[in-house]
Amino acid sequence: MIKRVLLMQLLIFLSIFTQETPKKNIKTDYISPYSFNVTVERIENELKKMNIPVFAKFDHSLNAKKVNLDLGEITVIVFGSPKVGTLLMQKRPEVAIELPLKVLISVNKHNQTEIKLQDIQKIAKDYNLENDDIILKMETFLNKLAEKTIAKD
């Protein structure tokens, strides 16, 4: 009886710690040659040039400092085009939780500025929108935004 209980406890323990880690809806594709602040500014400027509205900018570093905590450099910019996002939400309303689009800019442990993009293909898969033209355009747009941001002038 004791062996059976111990075996059950071991199985429960193993099942808890061997579960697959959930896949993130972000990916790191770009290292900026510019400083953190310059990279944030360049992203904002690129969005402005493309007439893409910025809905919010979250300076998580500043928010952490306000409560006497240190976070390092982390900012999230929320942006998008209702002309594009609305079409996607008409097909799958629940995808609205993923929109508007976001880009995360942070400094890694090697003191490099990273640009982290939403993994549009993962989102497409999660909402059964693979191979949708709008999804492909969003992915192309995000990559173009990052590439223009890190391009040498």
Model-derived regions: residue spans:
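Soluble non-cytosolic domains of exported or imported proteins
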Residues: 33-38, 55, 129-136
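Hydrophobic h-region of N-terminal signal peptides that target proteins for export
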Residues: 10-18
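Terminal, regulation- and interaction-focused segments at domain boundaries
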Residues: 19-52
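Beta-strand/loop substructures that line and gate deep hydrophobic ligand-binding cavities in soluble
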Residues: 103-128
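Compact, glycine-rich, soluble single-domain proteins
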Residues: 48, 57-104
